[in-house]
Design a protein with these regions (language model features):
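Glycine-rich flavin
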Residues: 2-8, 24-184, 212, 217-221, ...
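Beta1/beta-strand and adjacent pyrophosphate-binding region of the FAD-binding site
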Residues: 3-18, 184-194
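N-terminal Rossmann-like FAD-binding beta1-loop-alpha1 element of flavoenzymes
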Residues: 10-35, 197-205
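Short hydrophobic core segments
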Residues: 11-13, 124, 145-156, 190-191, ...
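Conserved phosphate-binding and hydrolysis motifs of nucleotide-dependent enzymes
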Residues: 14-19, 156, 192-197, 208, ...
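Glycine/Thr-rich phosphate-binding loops of Rossmann-like dinucleotide-binding domains
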Residues: 21, 161-163, 168, 199, ...
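FAD-site-proximal beta/loop scaffold in flavoenzymes
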Residues: 168-184, 277-334
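Active-site substrate-recognition segment that forms the wall
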Residues: 196-217, 238, 313-317, 324-327, ...
Length: 334
């Protein structure tokens, strides 16, 4: 099985914050390493995972732009700086964000070259296994197979869909679509007052959207200290973001021109929200299907996470899983 196929000490599937760092560290320890990742942006490989491509990095770039706009609009005159009413060029703002993301992508590719890591741009998946390791297939820009003595699974997660409501990334948006809007929506609805919903709501509110957030939990950040929750709620209300808690979403309808959300409020009363765009941020789920895990018998728990022990070992010999694939906070620094 291995005679005409390149063999590596370690193959890492996924090049997000967990995957690319694992690959680099393994290479620094003297192991031969291959890292496989299928993310492509504008026809170019885009390692870095959700954090780099559609998460932490681009959201902070847009947050900085929106904060600067707000400062100029609302605070410049306090400093004796008088400007005409500032206007927003969203495409230029998005282009700046994309440039920052590309710089990060290219930085990771440089680190791979520096550490003599073989990078393959495509979907990595299990083909078969034997007593020596695992045959890994690659489909995408790079089409090949490699043999791994050890495997690190780091394919991350994807946004959770509302049942029966797919993301079209035009009117019904995940975090990815919300970071690529071509103009400021007049009305923006958000389902879920977690990190993603709050941050993106804050960005588009500063830029002029009327933002309304519906949250199933009875309060904002209920698992945080109560004082923090109160101060956060106060800050978001001062921005003018409308929040409603304790709601139950009954249906979401996209009629092409607007999105209609039917829900029950905290008192059980039927209500509706009509918006131009809707961001659904109700959590994320492990991105496991592309691995063809059943081929080798990888064990998952009842929620679809890869089962691991205290050292992140799976039920398969010499296979580890890290990051969003395993239980715990879905955070880049986990």
């Amino acid at each position: 099985m291995k005679d005409d196929i390149q063999t590596f000490d370690v193959v890492v599937i996924g090049a997000g914050p967990g995957g690319y760092v694992s690959a680099i560290r393994a290479a620094q320890l003297g192991l031969t390493v291959c890292c496989i990742d299928d993310w492509v942006t504008d026809g170019k490989p885009a390692p870095g995972g959700t954090c780099t491509n559609v998460g932490c990095i681009p959201s902070k770039a847009l947050l900085a732009s929106s904060c600067l706009f707000e400062e100029i609009r609302d605070k410049a005159s306090e400093h004796g700086i008088h400007v005409e009413e500032p206007t927003i060029d969203v495409p230029t703002m998005i282009a700046r964000k994309a440039k920052i993301v590309r710089q990060t992508n290219d930085g990771i590719l440089y680190l791979f070259r520096k550490n003599k890591i073989t990078f393959l741009n495509g979907r990595g998946f299990f083909v078969t296994s034997d007593e020596d390791g695992y045959l890994i297939g690659v489909e995408g820009r790079d089409e090949t197979r490699v043999f791994a003595k050890n495997v690190v699974l780091a394919t991350g997660s994807k946004p959770r869909q509302f049942p029966g409501v797919p993301f079209d990334e035009e009117r019904i948006l995940s975090n990815e679509g919300a970071l690529k809007l071509k103009s400021v929506p007049s009305t923006l609805g958000i389902i879920g007052a977690g990190v993603i919903g709050l941050e993106l709501g804050s960005v588009w509110k500063r830029l002029g959207a009327d933002v309304r957030i519906l949250e199933a939990m009875p309060s904002l950040l209920p698992f945080a200290d109560s004082a923090i929750s109160r101060e956060a709620l106060k800050a978001f209300k001062q921005q003018g973001i409308d929040m409603e808690f304790g709601v139950h979403i009954d249906s979401i309808q996209n009629d092409g021109d607007r999105v209609i959300v039917q829900y029950k409020d905290k008192d059980g009363k039927n209500s509706e929200m009509w918006v131009d765009r809707l961001i659904i941020s109700i959590g994320r789920v492990p991105f496991i299907a592309a691995l063809d895990a059943p081929v080798v018998g990888l064990k998952l728990d009842e929620r679809g996470f890869v089962e691991v022990d205290a050292e992140n070992r799976t039920n398969l010999p010499r296979v580890w899983a890290i990051g969003d694939l395993v239980k715990g906070p879905m955070l880049a620094h986990k």
